Amino acid sequence: MIVQFVALLLLNLLQIIAAESSHTNNWAVLISTSRFWFNYRHTANVLGIYRSVKRLGIPDSQIILMIADDYACNSRNLFPGTVFDNADRALDLYGEEIEIDYKGYEVTVEAFIRLLTERVPENTPASKRLLTNERSNILIYMTGHGGDGFIKFQDAEELSSEDLADAIEQIHQHKRYNEILFMVDTCQANSLYTKIYSPNVLAIGSSEVGTSSYSHHADIDIGVAVIDRFTFSNLEFLENRVDSKSKLTMQDLINSYNPYEIHSTPGVQPINLRRSPDDILITDFFGNVRDIELHSEKINWMLPGENTTKPSIKRNSFVFQAQNDMQDDGKGFGISNLKSFLPPTRELKYKKHPISRIISAVVCISFSIGFPYYASKYLK
């Protein structure tokens, strides 16, 4: 019995190690639930986060952007077609080729729940669907007006903490995520994640139960506040300290929160999380998994028969020789040594887990020794 228990324990350890290496793609669901001109800052909040995740590599195809009102085209906007999150108006958040997937009255509690649970009509385009799998990390960022255990949508309906928790559990049961970062900027934000019970969720809120979240500053010409303090704190960290190769962790971001500057007490709740925030890179949620390098250098390719001498191909100051292997014998373009001619491709390297091999060996030995004894004694 002891051998059997040890074997099961080791199998569980193997599953944990495998799960930690299963993260292959990142998705972001970014939503501003408010409408009306005086809530301009909520759209600026979400567009600021949207810009950060795009800068760090998440493509629009893996970002669901939901904005409940069109402030860029509002008749009160002194700067038509723009949205700013700073009074200096140095960066137009609406001019970054944004792709809004749900807007106006499309942004409802029902639409949000259907998006998370993939209970959408069959003809719903991919841009309006959360096409995640068990290897997906999901960032869910919400901003708007809220209260104890709810957040308002369109100033007409509410999403409760219970409904949110049940939706996340459905995602879990259908194996549609690896880990979730739930971040919310609203009054009494921390109450919105108290009912979540699904595993591997890191929840961060802007304010405690019974307290409000506050705007950071206003633009005199626009006439309203342009960003909230909690989101401003996050963007200040992300934009100034994080790039696509950053090794900063979620704990570093959490440690940067200053309640005195934010004017509220942010909350952090790891919910059945298998990793510590110290071990979770910020780019595990805000960046792209693939490390993509863009090259602007021109490559002088030679057509067959143009030059029979050894052509050189320059790429990143490295010279590759085709070794006269380019031939055109009338039967088509042939290269006898393709690797010597083509530009190099970077080999994909995956993290190895040597401990898993040791554990596997121990499990096999345990079974080979323990099972015959167990069978002879209990299975007669």
UniProtKB/Swiss-Prot annotation:
Keyword Ion transport belongs to the record: no
Chain ranges on the Lumenal side, renumbered to this chain: 20-354
GO CC term, one of those recorded: GPI-anchor transamidase complex
Cellular localization per UniProt: Endoplasmic reticulum membrane
Keyword Disulfide bond attributed: yes
Domain of life: Eukaryota
Membrane spanning stretches: 355-375
Glycosylation-annotated residues: N307
GO biological process, one term: attachment of GPI anchor to protein
Role this protein plays: Mediates GPI anchoring in the endoplasmic reticulum, by replacing a protein's C-terminal GPI attachment signal peptide with a pre-assembled GPI. During this transamidation reaction, the GPI transamidase forms a carbonyl intermediate with the substrate protein.
Family (UniProt): Belongs to the peptidase C13 family.
Record protein name field: GPI-anchor transamidase
Record gene name: gpi8
